[in-house]
């Protein structure tokens, strides 16, 4: 008679076993949940990136419009300053050619020309938008690299102009003005007062040096103004196609 085999003891149920059975039975559900989670995260990141890009584009438009307006105003002012500076240079050249033997025929015209030569046309740039771009760290929203470089070149050129204009003012006040005030009465009330011996002034070294200083300084500034005008037009040409 055959012996009955002893019954096998059931395997102990562990947490790993339970997990294994759950995975076997419900793996499609788990996979679907993982896919849904990944998809949700991806959509969330994409939406955040879209919102960020849209905000940057809107901010860029605000700055581009501000820059365009500022520089457009600058160019109008530059054209006026260039025109006045050219007139100052022409008048200074005319006065430099006078001599005691061939003076200005009219004293009043002579004084008027001297007064005009010492006009100081100034260029004051509108830089509020550019300053805000730098101070807020928003320069990164300007997507065009060439535009950013051109902006820095333009406002660096403006700083050069300010330095030359400041030096011009100091020279005029300390060197030129004291001499002229001793030799001529430049007030409007004196224009009709006849003077004698004034033509001799045109041959004085101090007078010719004063005119030379004015002419050379204004010629330097004229070059700087014209360069700024060129840079400004280039910037407007870069900005205009990007405006909405």
Give the location of each predicted region.
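Hydrophobic membrane-insertion alpha-helices, especially the h-region
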Residues: 33-46
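Long, hydrophobic alpha-helical segments that serve as membrane-spanning/inserting helices
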Residues: 1-28, 46-244
């Amino acid at each position: 008679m055959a012996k009955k085999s002893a019954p096998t003891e059931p395997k102990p149920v562990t947490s790993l076993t339970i997990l294994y059975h759950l995975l076997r039975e419900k793996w499609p559900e788990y996979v679907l949940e993982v896919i849904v989670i990944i998809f949700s995260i991806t959509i969330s990141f994409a939406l955040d990136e879209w919102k960020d890009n849209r905000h940057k584009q809107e901010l860029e438009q605000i700055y581009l419009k501000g820059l365009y307006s500022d520089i457009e105003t600058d160019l109008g002012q530059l054209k006026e300053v260039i025109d006045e500076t050219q007139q100052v240079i022409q008048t200074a050249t005319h006065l430099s050619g006078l001599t005691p033997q061939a003076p200005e025929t009219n004293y009043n015209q002579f004084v008027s020309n001297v007064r005009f030569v010492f006009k100081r046309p100034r260029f004051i740039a509108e830089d509020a938008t550019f300053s805000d771009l730098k101070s807020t760290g928003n320069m990164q929203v300007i997507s065009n690299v060439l535009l950013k470089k051109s902006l820095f070149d333009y406002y660096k050129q403006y700083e050069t102009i300010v330095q030359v204009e400041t030096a011009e003012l100091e020279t005029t006040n300390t060197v030129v003005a004291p001499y002229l005030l001793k030799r001529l009465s430049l007030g409007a009330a004196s224009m009709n007062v006849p003077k004698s011996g004034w033509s001799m002034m045109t041959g004085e070294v101090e007078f010719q040096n004063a005119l030379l200083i004015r002419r050379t300084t204004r010629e330097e500034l004229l070059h700087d103004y014209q360069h700024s005008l060129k840079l400004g037009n280039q910037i407007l040409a870069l900005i205009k196609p990007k405006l909405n």
